[in-house]
Amino acid sequence: MGSGSSSQWMRSGSSAAAHSRAVALRDRGLRALKIRFHHPDWRDDVRVVEAVRAAVGDGMEIMVDANQGWRMPGDLAPAWDLATARECAAALEPLRIHWLEEPLPTADLDGYAALVASTSVPIAAGEMVRQEHEARDLLTRGGIAVIQCDVLFCGGIGGCRRIAGLARELGCSWSPHTWSNGYGLVANLHAACALSNHGYVEVPYDPPAWSAERRDWMLPFVLEIAGDGTIAPPPGPGLGIEPDLDALERWRVA
């Protein structure tokens, strides 16, 4: 049975807190982590990345999520423009990050192409991609290095397989975003184990607000990351899991 290399997500927070959290994850065997920007000034987030890189050295991959791909109704600040994305990418170049994720709105294909041409930092995008043509545009017109489509959103395992195959033909990788629930994680793990160009599988984990128990509440067990930083899909037929019907019963409305 295969397994996927996992990356874990953390909000940038303070430099000191991120430093200690990153060291703890590294000591657990994690090979990679992703830092999500959230400060009003992205330069403060870059300082957090600097602290994490200093803490873990080159022993872990660091991904950075600028979180500019789409907006929530309550988001008051505008998305980054190309100039901001370029400036941020330039600041991150010395920190040897694995990728810069969604530094521009998903539909800004010309912006992505210009950014890719101006930086050595690999650019990732596409976590909310629903259709194959959207992924194709990001890969061919936008020139991104990593497509992040999720099995739950892009037509299931079959749809994701087609997109990952397109990425492979273009010399790009697929790394599922997987920010959903235990079922989504299991489905993406199975797909990742079957596809040769997958990179890391993102594992939602940001306690106490987002714990493994909260993520996997519908499953009969909690998915655990092994000491070598990998996570294996359940071994049974199909997805290898049955829903926890008792857990679902509490949400019955009729």
Please annotate each region the language model reported.
Residues 33, 65, 100, 138, ...:
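Conserved, mostly hydrophobic/aromatic
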Residues 2-7, 31-35, 62-66, 100-101, ...:
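Hydrophobic faces of well-ordered beta-strands that scaffold small-molecule active sites
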Residues 11, 78, 102, 125, ...:
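Hydrophobic alpha-helical scaffolding
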Residues 1-94, 213-254:
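N-terminal capping/lid subdomain adjacent to the active-site entrance of alpha/beta enzymes
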Residues 96, 107-124, 129-230:
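Shared catalytic-loop signature of beta/alpha-barrel
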Residues 92-103:
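Glycine/Thr-rich beta-alpha phosphate-binding loop at enzyme active sites
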